[in-house]
């Protein structure tokens, strides 16, 4: 057992490995010794890792070279790569596997470059996970597949080309060392399989990155699917009443007044949406008996003044130009069909079927409603002849008696026109007064 002083373990390791290392790469050792000298001489370290990498990036660009003392390339020939972190100079001296293939006289300006490089790059290696290479490979494939649809990608996320695995260790690491372009340049120069590194914007924090999807397209499509599903769920809840009202309104256009059956005659659009219009062809078919299998009795009410009616009217039409006469004719003794499967219909017309005919039709319906309990009616099926007698006469003159047409404003009947107008206005005023009195009585009666 030797009695001499035992040298420290670090010195002994250096003594054993130094000769073999100097015999292989003397100049590389000189470069490493120069780096160790920079460790001892410099005492004021940068304040943050971000500032260190910023200085390192500038030195790398000015020198035109790339340091090659951070990655183990001994297994590149077999397609594998060692991801063990190299954090101390002792580890580099022990394995000695970083070989430089460039010129040996290439020097980097700045003595603190190696210190910054060794403090910046290992952070990335420590943050990596075993599937980091596969993750980067998947991102490269996704970028190639979506390169043809760049206009669909949000421009605010273009700075995020690759996102590191979200492990707890990664979230705790500062974002400064990952923002330097030095690592990407070095990996590309060395031919490392890890050719894509994160380029995070300075304004984006790591906590915010956790809420961003790896693929902006996937995020937007997922959001759209979720929104579409929520909308499909919300529509029946919010618009159910509106949809039902629309269906009822569209269906009510085809139903008769008591909503029990569909209109037996084909209807056409008219001036007043609340009324049902039929064409002159339908009236002609009605007169010829084409609907007798479903209609037991029909009435054609000519609402024009008597001189107009006598000047020419539809065969079988009744001249009832006042509401009082109309109510007495139909409501004093309502007409009920003998066959419950058949119907009783009423067709109203005037010269143009614009004012007088629709007004008489509404008057009969209002009075009928008042005499029955909703929705029951004596006469649920009322129609208006579209275009009136003026449109019917030229097409079906043979169905008119006499075969002539006397307009309301005929110059030979001016006095009669004034007389009938005054009477109709008086009757209309009396009807409105009676309606107001009925409302007052209804409001004053106890509930």
Swiss-Prot record:
Transmembrane segments: none annotated. Its main location: nucleus. Phosphorylated by PLK4. Phosphorylated by PLK1, leading to activate the phosphatase activity. Phosphorylated by CHEK1 and MAPKAPK2. This phosphorylation creates a binding site for 14-3-3 protein and inhibits the phosphatase activity. Phosphorylation by PLK3 at Ser-213 promotes nuclear translocation. Ser-220 is a minor phosphorylation site. Phosphorylation by CDK1 occurs at G2 and G2-M transition and leads to increased activity. Spleen and thymus. It is an enzyme of class 3 (hydrolase). The gene is Cdc25c. Disulfide bonds: none annotated. The keyword Secreted does not apply. The modification Phosphothreonine is found at residues 66, 129. Residues 294-401 form the Rhodanese domain. It catalyses: O-phospho-L-tyrosyl-[protein] + H2O = L-tyrosyl-[protein] + phosphate. One of its GO terms (cellular component) is nucleus. This is M-phase inducer phosphatase 3. The keyword Cell cycle applies.
């Amino acid at each position: 057992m030797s009695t001499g002083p035992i040298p420290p373990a670090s010195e002994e390791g250096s003594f054993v490995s130094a000769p073999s290392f100097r015999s292989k790469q003397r100049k590389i050792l000189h470069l490493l010794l120069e780096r160790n000298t920079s460790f001892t001489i410099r005492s004021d370290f940068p304040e943050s890792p971000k500032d260190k990498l910023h200085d390192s990036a500038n030195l790398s660009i000015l020198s035109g070279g790339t340091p090659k003392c951070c990655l183990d390339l001994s297994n590149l020939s077999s397609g594998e790569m060692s991801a063990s972190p190299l954090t101390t100079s002792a580890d580099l001296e022990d394995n000695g596997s970083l070989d430089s293939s460039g010129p040996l006289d290439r020097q980097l300006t700045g003595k603190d470059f190696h210190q910054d490089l060794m403090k910046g790059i290992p952070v990335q290696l420590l943050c990596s996970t075993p599937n980091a290479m596969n993750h980067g490979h998947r991102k490269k494939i996704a970028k190639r597949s979506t390169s043809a649809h760049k206009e669909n990608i949000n421009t605010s996320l273009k700075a995020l080309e690759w996102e590191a695995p979200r492990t707890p260790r990664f979230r705790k690491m500062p974002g400064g060392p990952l923002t330097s372009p030095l690592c990407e340049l070095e990996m590309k120069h060395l031919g490392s399989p890890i050719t894509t590194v994160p380029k995070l914007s300075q304004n984006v924090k790591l906590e915010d990155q956790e809420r961003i999807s790896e693929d902006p397209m996937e995020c937007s499509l997922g959001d759209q699917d979720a929104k579409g599903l929520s909308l499909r769920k919300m529509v029946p809840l919010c618009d159910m009443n509106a949809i039902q009202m629309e269906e009822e309104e569209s269906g009510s256009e085809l139903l008769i007044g008591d909503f029990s059956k569909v209109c037996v005659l084909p209807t056409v659009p008219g001036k007043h949406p609340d009324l049902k219009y039929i064409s002159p062809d339908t009236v002609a078919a009605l007169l010829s008996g084409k609907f007798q299998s479903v209609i037991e009795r029909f009435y054609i009410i000519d609402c024009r003044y008597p001189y107009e009616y006598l000047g020419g009217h539809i065969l079988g039409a009744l001249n009832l130009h006042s509401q009082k006469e109309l109510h007495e004719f139909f409501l004093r003794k309502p007409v009920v069909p003998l066959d419950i499967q058949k119907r009783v219909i009423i067709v109203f017309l005037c010269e143009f079927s614009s004012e007088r005919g629709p007004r008489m039709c509404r008057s009969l319906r209002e009075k009928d409603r008042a005499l029955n309990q909703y929705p029951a009616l004596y006469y649920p099926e009322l129609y208006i002849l579209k275009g009136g007698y003026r449109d019917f006469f030229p097409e079906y003159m043979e169905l008119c008696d006499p075969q002539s047409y006397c307009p309301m404003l005929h110059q030979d009947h001016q006095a009669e026109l004034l007389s009938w107008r005054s009477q109709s206005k008086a009757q209309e005023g009396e009807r409105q007064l009676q309606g107001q009195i009925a409302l007052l009585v209804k409001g004053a009666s106890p509930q």
